[in-house]
Curated annotation (Swiss-Prot):
Reaction equations catalysed: [[Fe-S] cluster scaffold protein carrying a second [4Fe-4S](2+) cluster] + N(6)-octanoyl-L-lysyl-[protein] + 2 oxidized [2Fe-2S]-[ferredoxin] + 2 S-adenosyl-L-methionine + 4 H(+) = [[Fe-S] cluster scaffold protein] + N(6)-[(R)-dihydrolipoyl]-L-lysyl-[protein] + 4 Fe(3+) + 2 hydrogen sulfide + 2 5'-deoxyadenosine + 2 L-methionine + 2 reduced [2Fe-2S]-[ferredoxin]
Chain segments annotated as coiled-coil in the UniProt record: none
UniProt source species: Picrophilus torridus (strain ATCC 700027 / DSM 9790 / JCM 10055 / NBRC 100828 / KAW 2/3)
Name recorded for this polypeptide: Lipoyl synthase
Lineage: Archaea, Methanobacteriati, Thermoplasmatota, Thermoplasmata, Thermoplasmatales
Keyword Iron-sulfur assigned: yes
Amino acid sequence: MNAGPINYKVKLPSGERYTFIKSTLSARNLYTVCEEAHCPNIAECWESGTATFMIMGSNCSRGCRFCAVTHGRMLPLDPMEPEKVYESVKMMNLDYVVITSVDRDDLPDKGSSHFAAVIRRLKDLKIKIEVLIPDFSGVHKFIDKIIDERPDVIAHNIETVRRLTKTVRDPRAGYDQSLNVLRYVKSRSNIITKSSIMLGLGETDDEVIETLHDLHDAGVDIVTIGQYLRPTKKQLEVKEYSPMERFKNLEESAYSIGFSFVASGPLVRTSYRAAEAFVKGGFKND
């Protein structure tokens, strides 16, 4: 394992498409997780016409120790947000859109009705819709609101191995709770499910493989594995930088376990090349 940083090549944000998307989002006071979480793939994804919209505000009610999303005062939801997202996606002429959100533990339904309203509005565009959801405190009736809108993919991230969960994630999150969310989605539908694991927080390969088995047993179809990169000095330090060989070996292990599609590499994130995962995984709409 490498103790020091490896030269992970990241394209700097630039280009006409990038500038257009950034100005479109700013004009509508919309947020992307690409910006808020300091995603290293922002240039590549935006230039290819893909963006992950982050709804329900820019402040999160939780404080996971790996995440750069802010935790300030929780503001009221914008009732016009479903329309703003719809208009932005339409203007960008996207074929595949990813919607995620901050946690809103301050709201009675954890924001599930608002999240569902955004999906419902986007359905009018006849495009592929992937959602990366919070755990909604594990409450089934809140998760049902998302399932009932029938997005093409429902993702929820396990983030790390069982042993490190309490160190890495907010106390209100949980390893088993995340598995239960994914298991419940699959039990109620045939919607494609997806999750993600970060490397570099002190986990062992055996622990990662155990987590892959847990995710597969919960019915997860797609898994992504990426390197944790410390966003700012406020977040957890990187314990190790994994070489490409480690990502390749874990990808092979994941496929042998039975996942339909695996993306594994230093800069891979949950929504990275999401449309490709849908196509190469051999998935089809009902």
